[in-house]
UniProtKB/Swiss-Prot annotation:
Pfam families registered for this protein in UniProt: PsbI
Keywords: Chloroplast, Membrane, Photosynthesis, Photosystem II, Plastid, Reaction center, Thylakoid, Transmembrane, Transmembrane helix
Listed name of the protein: Photosystem II reaction center protein I
One BP term from GO: photosynthesis
UniProt main location, coarse: plastid
Keyword Protein biosynthesis tagged: no
Protein task: One of the components of the core complex of photosystem II (PSII), required for its stability and/or assembly. PSII is a light-driven water:plastoquinone oxidoreductase that uses light energy to abstract electrons from H(2)O, generating O(2) and a proton gradient subsequently used for ATP formation. It consists of a core antenna complex that captures photons, and an electron transfer chain that converts photonic excitation into a charge separation.
Localization: Plastid, Chloroplast thylakoid membrane
Transmembrane segments: 4-24
Assembly description: PSII is composed of 1 copy each of membrane proteins PsbA, PsbB, PsbC, PsbD, PsbE, PsbF, PsbH, PsbI, PsbJ, PsbK, PsbL, PsbM, PsbT, PsbX, PsbY, PsbZ, Psb30/Ycf12, at least 3 peripheral proteins of the oxygen-evolving complex and a large number of cofactors. It forms dimeric complexes.
UniProt membrane topology term: Single-pass membrane protein
Annotated organism of origin: Emiliania huxleyi
A Gene Ontology cellular-component term: photosystem II reaction center
Length: 38
């Protein structure tokens, strides 16, 4: 069960970070200097 819990937490953190990065990278008002990192 411990390994399963670690796997679940890893997947959740991965998706949350991916969603956050995507949201911030698509918001030019918050990151005006990241337009060249498309």
């Amino acid at each position: 069960m411990f390994t399963l819990k670690i796997l679940v937490y890893t997947v959740v953190i991965f998706f949350v970070s991916l969603f956050t990065f995507g949201f911030l990278s698509n918001d030019p008002s918050r990151n005006p200097n990241r337009k060249d990192l498309e």
